[in-house]
């Protein structure tokens, strides 16, 4: 594919989109999602891996809570990947990731993912480009492995916010008592590296697109949630699942 230029992609909903109408539609979509997730769990022939990437304050946590929070917790798993531990660093970079690959019947959500190992690591020059491109090839092979050998369907979302909106949200973490627990002064340091992160994300989109990325405008939470929920709903509907019948002895 041609190289994606994030600076040329809008971070907001099209002007003609109505906020309240979209929220009303989302209620219906979430009801469909609930039924489809139950069907996925009952049939247990497929699994779904949802990868969520984005800059700090892009709304990853809120998206997971508002779109997936009302689904049956028996069939939905969420893993947030932080900085690797000493044990994890002693293995290949995908070791800790593969441990959370979804079993058939499950939806697995990655809050950050294997892509951190070719993003922040490059921005801070912890790895060189040669290592990064080898890792990208490994990621492509790993995603193909899940698709081909476990009927895992993969959706990859990049939550696309503007630097101004990021700054507003980071500032709110200082001012709002309900959000102060999220505050981390390092987030401001990382925000200063915005252009470097955009460059690395764009390179990642180009070289890790065998499973395509969805670039989701994320300045407005209502629109972001609608786009992600709709994409997940459509993916599950496309599996043409059926409830199993009575088991014969």
Predicted ranges, named:
Residues 16-24, 74-134:
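Conserved nucleotide-sensing/catalytic segment adjacent to the nucleotide-binding pocket
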Residues 120-138, 147-198, 246-248:
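A glycine- and Lys/Arg-enriched "phosphate-lid" helix/loop adjacent to the NTP-binding pocket
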Residues 63-64:
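Post-Walker A alpha-helix
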Residues 32-41:
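Pre-Walker A adenine-sensing motif
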Residues 60:
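Conserved lysine of the Walker
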Residues 50-53, 152-165, 184-189, 207-227:
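Phosphate-binding beta-loop-alpha motif at adenosine-nucleotide cofactor sites
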Residues 193-249:
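NTP-dependent small-molecule kinase module
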